[in-house]
């Protein structure tokens, strides 16, 4: 019997109700359904000495999810999709994202369209779009103390009531970069429309093989976002006496101490999104973020 996954934000009553209905329909169509919570993709703890789960990003993969699974349906908002990406990318399971949240920038369909979407899925009328993911590791000497997959961004920033941060950042074999700011963001093209955008970074189309370094509130007129090849590994050395907070995709994170360093590299496990229709990126930007809309209404023609 073919298997399908069902990942949901079980803290939302709407998502849970929809999941039960979808599960029933799929089982009647002859599929085995493995239903799990998106909370399994969250990786966080108070400090690197208090792990919530086994170290290593493969630990987020739910039981029953493996490369033989046809696909997984994700029910929730963008945060749920980010967690689900961490649960599915290591085993290459493609995800169909159904929005039950607010913005739904990463969603392919909405709940009112679920019946039509299921028909296309069961008829295999879909394509795969692969998005770059990153591996984020916290190192102390040669010891790996924390690790997670990242679809959007890694943000490393100061805690409240602490001073401005200083960072030395090494990108591949290039000369190190010194940045003084409240923090730094290292993002994928997918993440260029998230936190990095709010910090003044440019929008990057998803098919570009690049990464982006964006300072958060830099204390310099010369410190701006930098775009570079995604083949370049990045190392961030905190040069500040206070501990820092690291947040990955808003659903994972830990503290980073002065003696630690953060390694970021492109993952061998892209996130595989199912596309049911033509997913034209500029149209998504226009619809979700208002890109390219006129600032004033154009007069009607009579």
From Swiss-Prot:
Its main location: cytoplasm. Keywords: ATP-binding, Cytoplasm, Kinase, NAD, NADP, Nucleotide-binding, Transferase. It is found in: Cytoplasm. One of its GO terms (cellular component) is cytoplasm. Gene3D superfamilies: Probable inorganic polyphosphate/atp-NAD kinase, domain 1 (3.40.50.10330), Probable inorganic polyphosphate/atp-NAD kinase, domain 2 (2.60.200.30). It catalyses: NAD(+) + ATP = ADP + NADP(+) + H(+). InterPro entries: ATP-NAD_kinase_N, ATP-NAD_kinase_PpnK-typ_C, NAD/diacylglycerol_kinase_sf, NADK. One of its GO terms (biological process) is NADP biosynthetic process. NAD(+) binds at residues 78-79, 152-153, 182, 193-198, 217. GO terms for molecular function: ATP binding; metal ion binding; NAD binding; NAD+ kinase activity. Its EC number is 2.7.1.23. The active site is at 78 (proton acceptor). The keyword Nucleotide-binding applies. The keyword Cell cycle does not apply. Involved in the regulation of the intracellular balance of NAD and NADP, and is a key enzyme in the biosynthesis of NADP. Catalyzes specifically the phosphorylation on 2'-hydroxyl of the adenosine moiety of NAD to yield NADP. HAMAP family: NAD_kinase (MF_00361). Belongs to the NAD kinase family. This is NAD kinase 2. The gene is nadK2.
